[in-house]
């Protein structure tokens, strides 16, 4: 009888421990301005021009003990590009750049997540301007824990670089402006 009880307790403890290490799904919290997708590019090599995409949605799966189980999916409405300059934004939405009339969305879907020191390398496919290319985002967990509303949250920062010509954006902006740095800060609410 004691052996059956010990076996039952051991199996129960094992199941509880295994369950707590399972990857959790999160919805990116953009409603409360807790997530940002920004970019910067050199302006003629003299200064940085910053912008953002204000309309996007996404989710991620996170297991800090098993990064191979992690996933990231983001959909960006490219019409929401915002550089704090209406005329430039109109130009960026046009055929020479984002061509939002033909390609209203950009997407990122991870294919692999690897632990990299105290952060993660998130490798995936970015589709922009009708072209899909592999991109690596270097990411760090900024924090995780319970929120005051009974939920659980996890936040990350990530950045990576893309070459404009890789995505059929061939407008000549000069030699110092061939790459765009992507800068992401996201907070996700665990899906129950």
UniProtKB/Swiss-Prot annotation:
NCBIfam families: PRK03757.1. It is found in: Periplasm. It comes from the Bacteria. InterPro entries: Lipid/polyisoprenoid-bd_YceI, TTHA0802/YceI-like_sf, UPF0312/YceI. Transmembrane segments: none annotated. GO terms for cellular component: extracellular space; periplasmic space. Belongs to the UPF0312 family. Type 1 subfamily. Its main location: periplasm. Coiled coil: none annotated. This is UPF0312 protein YPO2315/YP_2102. Residues 1-23 form the signal peptide.
């Amino acid at each position: 009888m004691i052996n059956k009880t010990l076996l039952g307790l051991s199996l129960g403890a094992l199941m509880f421990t295994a369950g707590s290490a399972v990857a959790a799904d999160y919805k990116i919290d953009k409603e409360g301005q807790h997530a940002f997708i920004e970019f910067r590019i050199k302006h003629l090599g003299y200064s940085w021009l910053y912008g953002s995409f204000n309309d996007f949605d996404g989710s991620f799966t996170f297991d800090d003990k098993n990064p191979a189980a992690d996933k990231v999916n983001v959909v960006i409405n490219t019409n929401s590009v915002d550089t704090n300059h209406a005329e430039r934004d109109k130009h960026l939405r046009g055929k020479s750049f984002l061509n939002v009339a033909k390609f209203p969305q950009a997407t990122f879907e991870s294919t692999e997540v690897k632990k990299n020191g105290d952060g993660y390398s998130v490798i995936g496919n970015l589709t922009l301007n009708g072209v899909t290319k592999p991109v690596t985002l270097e990411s760090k967990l900024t924090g995780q824990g319970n929120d005051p509303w009974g939920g659980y949250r996890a936040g990350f920062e990530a950045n990576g670089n893309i070459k404009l010509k890789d995505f059929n954006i061939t407008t000549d902006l000069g030699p110092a402006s061939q790459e765009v740095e992507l800068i992401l800060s996201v907070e996700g609410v665990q899906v129950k």
